[in-house]
């Protein structure tokens, strides 16, 4: 049965489950792949933070150094290797070749690398550097001191960009028809949030195993063993789903027609220089890129300070990891709620600008409250006493709420308005602009915040000392964000109006041509 011959869905089913029965053969393995990749992403994200922040002689100040000096170069090296392998291997072999290094490293980490950390880590050399260099270089020294943990952090960061953005979405975009994508992709988004709801409790469970362990057993080492075992099981499911898709789905003409899918335009590959040039020539794209950059920097500025507070409250890695598991779970709960009941309604009722401004305003308000609690904690004794907690714990909880609300509004509103901004553009602008923003904005958003924090760390010496300056930087960047969104809204409305007028004129011309054809038909019949 073809897609066009099938009955349309009812209103409720089109909202909850817009999938035909025969399409389950294609949807379920893709959904399971996306779920497992997202599950692993959460496991690795929470574990990498726990390793680095709670490591001996380390803390949250190491994160900006790792992101700028290790993650960014590693991403570039990976892309060079990937480009080379893509010319040598077929697509199926390439997928397994990319997955293999993650499987090997994360399999070895809990059984070989972590138990041998005392041998592998240059503790004496790091101590010597710490006695020579200023305190502002502590993050850099911590990166060297715990280099195996830094490698874990880098590969965890690469998992999201490589397996999620590149491998899964590249595979999905290649084999999915446009008519299917409109129905399938929203379900994949639900799968990502369901993964948060399951991975959070899994992290909590593995982090609390120490209660049943005997004396002399490293509880965090045991937790790592189970966390990485879960990761490897998910990788096995990912590999099995990918193999099954290639064996049974891509050989079914109902689901995959290479000739038909070749008509879909591919995104051009643009160098960094070409991306800069394209963005600078287009005010519309430059403003859109600024939105992405500002979000990345703002989240980075708040997260590192929050994680430094989190370490002070939970210095034990198991306690830290358990808290991060709870954080991931509630991020999933709030994200699902916001996506289902708030996101679309805000844009439909109040328009693009309101939807675009919700995320920066949320980051501004919650970030201001968080930084105020960190900076003026000694003056908040009345509030702390009324809540029956400590100033530190209050800052940790408010920071968690800030992160959860910022990320949930980002998923539901920021991403939606960003994608909507491409709609009124012509095909060339859509394709080239998106490619330029993926290259420039994504990298600047991730590394920009790290660069600001490194500069402040070197000057101020510690995260605590630089916190007031981070608050000022956050406020300044959000002002740029709000201004860019407001200016982009004017261009968006103008472009949308022009697009609608163009479509209306095209429809009128088509109607006029159709009427003329009907009028000429009787005359032709009379002549005949």
From Swiss-Prot:
Q: Which SUPFAM superfamilies match?
A: MFS general substrate transporter (SSF103473)
Q: Which GO terms describe its cellular component?
A: plasma membrane
Superkingdom classification of source: Bacteria
Q: What InterPro entries has UniProt attached to this entry? A: ADP_ATP_car_bac_type, MFS_trans_sf
Q: Where in the cell?
A: Cell membrane
Principal place of residence: membrane
Among the GO molecular function terms of this UniProt record, one is: ATP binding
For membrane topology, the record states: Multi-pass membrane protein
User: PANTHER family under this entry?
Assistant: ADP,ATP CARRIER PROTEIN 1 (PTHR31187:SF1), PTHR31187
Q: Which family does it belong to?
A: Belongs to the ADP/ATP translocase tlc family.
Record-linked NCBIfam families: AAA
Name of this protein: ADP,ATP carrier protein 1
């Amino acid at each position: 049965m073809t897609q066009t011959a099938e009955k349309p869905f009812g209103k409720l089913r089109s909202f909850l489950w817009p999938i035909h029965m025969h399409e389950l053969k294609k949807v379920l393995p893709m959904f399971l792949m996306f779920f497992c990749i997202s599950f692993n992403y959460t496991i690795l994200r929470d574990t990498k933070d726990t390793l680095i922040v709670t490591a001996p002689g380390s803390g949250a100040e190491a994160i900006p150094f790792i992101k700028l000096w290790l993650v960014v170069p590693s991403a570039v090296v990976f892309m060079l290797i990937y480009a080379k392998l893509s010319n040598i291997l077929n697509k199926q072999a390439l997928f397994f070749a990319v997955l293999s290094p993650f499987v090997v490293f994360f399999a070895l980490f809990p059984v070989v690398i972590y138990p041998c950390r005392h041998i592998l880590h240059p503790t004496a050399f790091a101590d010597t550097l710490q006695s020579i260099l200023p305190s502002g270089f502590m993050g850099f020294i911590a990166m060297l001191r715990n280099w195996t943990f830094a490698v874990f952090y880098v590969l965890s960061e690469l998992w999201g960009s490589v397996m999620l953005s590149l491998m899964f979405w590249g595979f999905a975009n290649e084999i999915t028809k446009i008519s299917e994508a409109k129905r399938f992709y929203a379900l994949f988004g639900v799968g990502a949030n369901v993964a948060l709801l399951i991975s959070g409790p899994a992290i909590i469970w593995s982090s609390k195993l120490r209660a049943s362990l005997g004396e002399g057993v490293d509880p965090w080492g045991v937790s790592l063993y189970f966390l990485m075992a879960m990761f490897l099981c998910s990788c096995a499911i990912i590999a099995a789903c990918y193999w099954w898709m290639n064996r049974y789905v891509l050989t079914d003409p109902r689901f995959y027609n290479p000739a038909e899918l070749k008509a879909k335009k591919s995104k051009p590959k643009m160098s960094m220089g070409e991306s800069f040039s394209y963005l600078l020539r287009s005010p519309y794209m430059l403003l859109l890129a600024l939105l992405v950059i500002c979000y990345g920097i703002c989240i980075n500025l708040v997260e590192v300070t929050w994680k430094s507070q989190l370490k002070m409250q939970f210095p034990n890695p198991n306690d830290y990891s358990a808290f991060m598991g709870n954080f991931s779970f509630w991020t999933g709960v709030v994200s699902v709620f916001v996506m289902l009941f708030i996101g679309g309604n805000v844009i439909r009722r109040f328009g693009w600008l309101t939807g675009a401004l919700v995320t920066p305003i949320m980051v501004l308000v919650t970030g201001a409250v968080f930084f105020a609690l960190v900076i003026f904690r000694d003056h908040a004794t009345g509030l702390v006493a009324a809540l029956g907690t400590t100033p530190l714990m209050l800052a940790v909880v408010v920071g968690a709420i800030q992160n959860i609300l910022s990320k949930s509004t980002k998923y539901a509103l920021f991403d939606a308005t960003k994608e909507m901004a491409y709609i009124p553009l012509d095909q060339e602008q859509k394709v080239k602009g998106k490619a330029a923003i993926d290259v420039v904005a994504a990298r600047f958003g991730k590394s920009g915040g790290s660069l600001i924090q490194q500069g402040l760390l070197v000057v101020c010496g510690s995260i605590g000392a630089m916190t007031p300056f981070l608050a000022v930087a956050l406020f300044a960047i959000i002002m740029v964000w709000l201004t860019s969104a407001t200016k982009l809204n004017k261009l968006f409305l103008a472009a949308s109006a022009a697009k609608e007028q163009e479509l209306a004129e095209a429809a009128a011309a088509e109607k006029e041509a159709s009427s003329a054809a009907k009028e000429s038909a009787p005359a032709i019949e009379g002549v005949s």
